[in-house]
Amino acid sequence: MDSAAAERPSSYAVNFPPLLPAPAPAVAGAMGVANHKSVLCMKWREGRCHNGVACRYAHGEEDQRIVPEMRVGGGGTSMHARSSPPRDGASSGSTASIAMAACRIEEQRHGRGGESFILPRSRRKRQALGSGSARSTAPTPPRAHTTPPCSRSVAAPRASTSPLRPSPVPPPATLHSAADVQRSVARALEDFEQRESSSSVFPLAIDIVAEDAMTATSEPSATSDDDAITTTTSSSTTDADELDAAVAAPPK
């Protein structure tokens, strides 16, 4: 009984089997089941892993491999454990635990984006190629024409046009009828005749005024001449009287 009890696994080992055995340290150039790398190296993702090829974790998707106990399911959308009969001393609970461990590894491998499982790598590549081709066939909008910035050392050419605003267009000429033209011509002739008549009357008035002025200046000169003649006559009479008186007087 003691030997049978010792060979029978405990309930803890049945309900909580180990998820995955720890991989053995990889050796350069050695390939085997123990060297399969199924988890990305967190230190490598942060850029501070110094183990290089000897690291037990994968450095990139090319270095990452799927565990042999995992296979692609029938639908190709999830990773499931191989449906093999349980080993000696293990029950069906261990198979379920292995499946859960495989799902956790797949989530750690590709990151948790909200979905339960991530598509396999081959199918993701096909979808990426399809989306890339569809994106390349989509028409691209035309780019806006932009002028290159002008260098400060190069002077910009002056504008050929004047900065002043153009003069406004003159208003259209008004149309006149024949009657309007005749009336304007008659009015111009009347104005011309009035100017001619006023210019002919003005010299005549000037001549009349000049004659009146000459007459007024000539009359005072005649009066003065008569006075001068009278004065001369009186003076000559006085001299004759004095001479007669001197002759008539007796000598002393």
UniProtKB/Swiss-Prot annotation:
Residues 133-149, 229-238 have a biased composition (Low complexity). It comes from the Eukaryota. Residues 71-95, 109-180, 215-252 are annotated as: Disordered. One of its GO terms (molecular function) is DNA binding. The keyword Heme does not apply. A zinc finger (C3H1-type) spans 35-62. Pfam families: zf-CCCH. Keywords: DNA-binding, Metal-binding, Zinc, Zinc-finger. SMART domains: ZnF_C3H1 (SM00356). This is Putative zinc finger CCCH domain-containing protein 58. It comes from Oryza sativa subsp. japonica. The lineage of its organism: Eukaryota, Viridiplantae, Streptophyta, Embryophyta, Tracheophyta.
